[in-house]
Amino acid sequence: MAAQSLYRRYRPQRFSELKGQEHIVRALKNSIVNSREGHAYLFSGPRGTGKTTTARILAKVLNCDSPVDGEPCCACPSCLAVQNGNSFDVIELDAASNNGVADIREIIASASLGSPGRNRVFILDEVHMLTKSAEAALLKTLEEPPTNVVFVLATTDPQKVGETIRSRTQHLQFHLLQESELEEHVRWVLADAGLDVSPETIEAVVRQGAGSVRDTLSALELAVAVGGIAEEATPVD
């Protein structure tokens, strides 16, 4: 079996593990603790800042058997199913390649079905890539959402998402991390993984990561593989 990449190995499984997005963690946990979850969210921000990861954590806690203070337990069957990517309650769609009205109608039909868990969560990535007709089909469902259905729309370009869609979602904006935050995270990953690299390598991968946890860990993995500072790292989607 191939070894997991550092990014996948250290992908956050709880809100508390997310780096540099405290404002989003606070908003989501408060809404869950107070039972004021939205039926539709728009997560926007640069690539590699945790939008899809946060959506999956939200899906976990909304279906968790034993949530604690707005966090998923990460141990119940529902949480494990989401973590393993085989949950019937969580449906993900890459709108960059599935952007037509037929794709959205399939999602809408699925939303009307019952769910084994408490909530059915639909995660639509790169939602700004939807066609106008697909957006119109989605809008109708957002205006009259089925019971116990939550939509999480993720995008790197929120201005390309129709205003009517944006107005019917809770918009949470993800930010790139500061270099100091990335350096702290890299040092923690190195210690936990039992890896040793030079301070110059840490500085280089943080610089290459340019604020993205995903790109930083991809650069770190390449640097470890070649035994030193990687001059250029290829981003991983």
Residue ranges and their predicted role:
Residues 59, 199, 210:
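N-terminal phosphate-binding caps/lids of nucleotide- and nucleic-acid-binding domains
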Residues 122, 187, 191, 201-208, ...:
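C-terminal helical "lid" of AAA+/P-loop NTPase domains
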Residues 71, 231-237:
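Short, intrinsically disordered, charge-balanced linker/junction segments flanking boundaries
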Residues 172-175, 179-203:
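Helix-loop-helix "sensor" segment of P-loop NTPases
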Residues 66, 193-197, 230:
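Short, polar/flexible loop-turn hinges at active-site or ligand-entry regions and domain interfaces
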Residues 1-171, 180:
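P-loop/Walker A NTP-binding region and its immediately flanking N-terminal helices
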Residues 17, 179, 198-199, 213-216:
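Alpha-helix N-cap/helix-initiation sites
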Residues 48, 98, 176-177, 196, ...:
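Short, surface-exposed acidic/glycine-rich loop or hinge patches that mediate macromolecular interfaces
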